[in-house]
Amino acid sequence: MSRSSKVVLGLSVLLTAATVAGVHVKQQWDQQRLRDGVIRDIERQIRKKENIRLLGEQIILTEQLEAEREKMLLAKGSQKS
């Protein structure tokens, strides 16, 4: 085999190995991004449920506060009469 043939073969093997390694690294990176996306979605769903629960509590507390204010206004109104 001539020297130039050996060089071309060596470069071809090197380029092929680099391409295969690059593809594997990119696949691993893509898989990790997919896993991270799923984890973020689950965390987002948990936060959404928590926010809905807190909103429900706030609505109940607001209704209780408004009822107490109404009672106080009625009590003050009956005292003035």
Swiss-Prot record:
Q: Which InterPro entries match?
A: Pet117 (IPR031568)
Q: Where in the cell is it found?
A: Mitochondrion
One Pfam match, given by its short name, reads PET117
Any GO BP annotation:
mitochondrial cytochrome c oxidase assembly
Keywords assigned: Disease variant, Mitochondrion, Primary mitochondrial disease, Transit peptide
Q: What does the entry list under GO cellular component?
A: mitochondrion
* The organelle targeting sequence, given as a residue range: 1-22
Q: Which disease is it linked to?
A: Mitochondrial complex IV deficiency, nuclear type 19: An autosomal recessive mitochondrial disorder with onset in infancy or early childhood. MC4DN19 is characterized by global developmental delay, impaired intellectual development, developmental regression, loss of acquired motor and language skills, and motor dysfunction. Patient tissues show decreased levels and activity of mitochondrial respiratory complex IV.
Q: Which family, according to the similarity comment?
A: Belongs to the PET117 family.
- Its recorded name reads Protein PET117 homolog, mitochondrial
> What organism does the UniProt record list as the source?
Homo sapiens
> What gene codes for this chain?
PET117
